[in-house]
């Protein structure tokens, strides 16, 4: 059966799988290669990652600091998710040229659209530096030395296993990345927030960009003289397709996982943090959605903001559901009990878990206060930029922005534990008479502020409050859900787990560094008697199509195509019916 497969290395996490798990470091993938071959992999470890020759790593990019992309041509053509390119698409959209709604396709290189502050990074190499740092070398020195090796080089030192290992990552950064194409939102965001993070899915979640470089193929700032980047390696697009049982692999930059955290932390996430953060974001989304429904200019203005808020909002809902359904807290507590039984006979680990749990009891309340502050007051602008002020929609935004200020102040006052509220906030509310009145006062000061006026319209208490919040949200000890002491204990805990649980295949948590995941293509059983196949088709889109609901209103051309069944070489026959694969 024919399948359409854009690339197995896409950042879309389609329904793969067997019971395989893991996000493996590519430089160490040789240790997994036998298992990969047993599942159908036919290449070598060097085909995946190599410093000395072109390999797959040279075609996988970190897109704009938070997404994965893949190079699919010898002239720098790049695929990434639609939602990853959403901000760039929005930046070029207007009521007259509504690329968000109608899509965009450059018909020549001259029509490709440059994007301010958009960049991609390609991994040059990664190397373990644990011993070098233990011997006294400083991470900053390693970074400086690596960045001096080439044009546009960027580097970082990242911890694995809570500091048991440390790796240096060296990237080549390209800052001239141009928009080539994107489908209409009715394709690229089909299903909207309802279908996000779930399977089955019918979303054409892709956008197309091109990397440009200097004539000598080096990173360069935007210039009309730049030329398409010539990659060391690019992926070809296969139209042969896949079937259940085939080997499949994901190569990309997963954001963050916490595989080894204690049951106390999971309990906090499931029963306290996620419910409150979901509720707060629901209120913000309701305000923004109401504004978008009244004005096409506001719909475009708030499109990326709405999408950014909704992405984690929907993820947390699934996280809460999944962790509850799998009884993750109870499972972890049983695992910890068995570890403790082993640790009791080993002085190095005997009191480890009790100390970790005591540290959690000490720091979870202030961390909760930090999370609430970040989700409320931390979402508000410290200033409106000149670029925002010059936008046609700026004055149109005023009622919505003021409503968001009021909502943030009220949610903060309601949910942040009193002992951790910013003192200047309490003083300001008391002086103004209510949270709404104080929110209005702060909003008016920020709304009218310009570069020349600076903060002249903000009284001292308001400036202190904003400064305090900026400090709080920028403090590493508060941002990190593990205190310095707890992080040290986790370092020992992971060491102990690896000594005790010798049958477990350990892999480092995701931290936005390049990883490999692999398995075999399969569907899954969502509930008793409810099996979802790993492939969706156009029939599913038509079944969901509803012109009355924005997220499910497909283009008329797609309805016409379905009616005619004129699918050309992309058509397949499933159960005697002609259709076309989607995801």
Identify the residue ranges that each predicted region occupies.
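Terminal presequence/propeptide segments associated with secretion/organelle targeting
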Residues: 2-4, 8, 15-583
């Amino acid at each position: 059966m024919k399948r359409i497969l854009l690339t197995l290395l896409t950042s879309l996490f389609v329904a793969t799988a067997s019971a395989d798990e893991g996000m493996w470091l590519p430089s160490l993938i040789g240790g997994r290669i036998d298992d990969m071959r047993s599942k159908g992999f036919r290449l070598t470890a060097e085909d995946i990652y190599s410093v000395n020759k072109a390999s797959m790593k040279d075609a996988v990019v970190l897109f704009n600091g938070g997404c994965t992309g893949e190079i699919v041509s010898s002239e720098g053509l790049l695929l990434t998710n639609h939602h990853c390119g959403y901000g760039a698409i929005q930046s070029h959209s207007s009521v007259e040229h509504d690329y968000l709604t109608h899509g965009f396709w450059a018909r020549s290189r001259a029509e490709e659209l440059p994007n301010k502050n958009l960049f991609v990074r390609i991994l040059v190499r990664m190397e373990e530096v644990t011993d070098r740092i233990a011997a006294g070398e400083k991470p900053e020195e390693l970074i400086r030395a690596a960045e001096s090796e080439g044009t546009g080089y960027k580097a970082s030192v990242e911890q694995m296993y809570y500091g048991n290992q440390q790796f240096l990552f060296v990237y080549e950064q390209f800052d001239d990345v141009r928009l080539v194409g994107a489908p209409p939102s009715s394709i690229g965001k089909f299903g909207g927030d309802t279908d996000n993070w779930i399977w089955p899915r019918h979303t054409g979640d892709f956008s197309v960009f091109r990397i440009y470089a200097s004539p000598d193929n080096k990173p360069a700032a935007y210039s009309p003289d730049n030329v398409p980047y010539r990659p060391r390696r690019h992926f070809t697009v296969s139209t042969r397709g896949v079937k259940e049982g085939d080997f499949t692999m994901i190569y990309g930059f997963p954001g963050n996982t916490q595989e080894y955290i204690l049951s106390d932390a999971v309990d906090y996430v499931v029963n306290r943090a996620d419910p409150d953060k979901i509720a707060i974001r629901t209120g913000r989304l309701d305000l923004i959605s109401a504004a978008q429904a009244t004005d096409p200019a506001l719909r475009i203005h708030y499109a990326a903001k709405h999408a950014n808020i909704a992405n984690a909002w929907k993820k947390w809902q699934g996280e809460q559901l999944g962790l509850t359904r799998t009884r993750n807290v109870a499972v972890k507590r049983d695992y910890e009990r068995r570890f403790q039984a082993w640790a009791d006979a080993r002085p190095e680990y005997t009191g480890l878990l009790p100390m970790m749990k005591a540290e959690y009891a000490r720091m979870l309340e202030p961390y909760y206060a930090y999370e609430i502050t970040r989700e409320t007051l931390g979402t508000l602008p410290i200033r409106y930029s000149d670029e925002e002020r010059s936008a046609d929609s700026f004055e149109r935004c005023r009622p919505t922005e003021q409503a968001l200020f009021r909502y943030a102040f009220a949610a903060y006052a309601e949910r942040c534990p009193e002992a951790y509220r910013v003192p200047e906030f309490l003083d300001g509310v008391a002086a103004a008479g209510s949270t709404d009145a104080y929110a209005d006062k702060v909003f008016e000061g920020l709304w009218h502020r310009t570069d020349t006026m600076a903060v002249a319209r903000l009284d001292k208490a308001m400036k202190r409050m904003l400064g305090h919040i900026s400090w709080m949200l920028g403090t590493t000890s508060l941002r990190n859900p593990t205190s310095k002491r707890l992080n040290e204990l986790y370092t020992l805990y992971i060491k102990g787990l690896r000594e005790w649980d010798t049958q477990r295949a350990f892999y480092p948590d995701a931290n936005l560094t390049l990883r490999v995941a692999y398995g075999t293509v399969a569907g899954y059983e969502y509930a008793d008697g409810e099996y979802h196949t790993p492939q969706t088709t156009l029939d599913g889109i038509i079944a969901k199509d509803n012109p009355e609901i924005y997220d499910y209103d497909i283009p008329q051309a797609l309805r016409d195509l379905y009616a005619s069944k004129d699918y050309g070489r992309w058509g397949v026959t499933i159960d005697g019916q002609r259709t076309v694969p989607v995801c």
